Amino acid sequence: MPLVMRKAAKRMAEDKRVDLLDRILAAHQSFYDIRRDCLFEGRTFPAFAEYHTYGEKYVLVKRAKLWEVNTHDFMFFECVDELDEARLAEEISFMKEKAIRKVNAGPNHMSSALSLVIIANHATEEALKLAKKTRFHKEYRFGFRGWTDLRLAVVDLSLSASKGVVVNNAGKQLKEVISNNLALIEQGPQTRKVQE
């Protein structure tokens, strides 16, 4: 393949990754605080989104509180050209060791989700298998201060929308939004509606 065609193909693949990332972020912008080119623990991510919710129950007046809870979701996004098993293992390790520092398991903490969405032009079969079998669950003070789960989604743009999105067990919520937006990209530029 001539150099000009290879450069054009690479640019199109990059555009598809960025287009999918933009669509996913647009689907989450109503509820999440989104930052582009986010620097965290010495690494720059193309995007980072966080969601916080607070709930409480009280009797008659707000001072007579029965309970209160906080839940959080921290979503890291990464765009890569090629994803192999070693690179995915590094990303998972980063989430378990460094991204978990985002979690503040205070007295009213109920749960936090650490989410990692990796958009790749191509992912190896081994990487997809590792993504599917990845498990991480951490409880704080025997569960009295809540828990954290790792939600992982790997998007292989070389596959169809139905087969190209692989998630772990905790990441099942991510699959529908990502698959729907990937299907819209595959339909072509005439479709501009963001799928939530």
What are the residue ranges of the model-derived segments?
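Charged, structured surface patches that assemble and position nucleic-acid processing machinery
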Residues: 133-196
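Nucleic-acid nuclease catalytic cores
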Residues: 106-132
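N-terminal, charge-rich interaction modules
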Residues: 2-79
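Exposed acidic/polar residues on beta-strands and adjacent loops within beta-sheet cores, strongest
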Residues: 57-58, 63-69, 121, 125-131, ...
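Catalytic micro-motifs at enzyme active sites that drive phosphoryl/nucleotidyl and oxygen chemistry
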Residues: 63, 102-106, 138-142
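Short, surface-exposed beta-edge/turn micro-motifs
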Residues: 71-74, 111-114, 150
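Active-site-adjacent loop/helix micro-motif of nuclease/hydrolase catalytic cores
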Residues: 82-97, 101, 125-129
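Structural motif
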Residues: 77-82, 118-121
